[in-house]
């Protein structure tokens, strides 16, 4: 798939086929996160690829919106150092947003769906993943082949009209 087609085809997938995602594809998706830009090239992140069904089921309970993780072929946990500094947290989470989007596009390019989730229960998430103290599991990204329909460019996405959100020169 070409980049523009991947951008147009990407959507949040919350229901997955039972087909496993090949390790090479999971590694490529994670590499997209590794290649994402970060503030001052700090790379305050780590990524944990999870394919074990028991771990996926356990992770689905760390946030009320993470139920889809249980049915995913895999999940990628996005981990950052714990900080009390608001500016550092803001920058780190912005960087994770870029890494997440890079992964969603890399996955879409392969015909693989993704669905993101926050993490509420840090202690539980750290225990499931073996994440050391001093780090937070910020987000989860469910990964798998869509159960409903393949990824294809969406002609009319459910979005606010483009001319309402794009401004030139001034608001």
Please provide the spans of the model-predicted regions.
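Short secondary-structure junction motifs
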Residues: 42-45, 109, 138
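A glycine-rich helix N-cap at a beta->alpha junction
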Residues: 67-77, 130-153
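Alpha-helix/helix-capping structural signal
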Residues: 11, 54, 120-123
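C-terminal helix-cap and adjacent tail motif
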Residues: 5-18, 139-171
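Glycine/small-residue-rich phosphate/adenosyl-binding loop
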Residues: 24-31, 35-96
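Short Asp/Glu-rich motifs
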Residues: 25, 52, 126-127, 133, ...
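Small-aliphatic-rich amphipathic alpha-helix that forms the alpha element of a beta-alpha
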Residues: 33, 76, 84-128, 141
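Charged, compositionally biased N-terminal leader segments and the immediate start
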Residues: 1-3
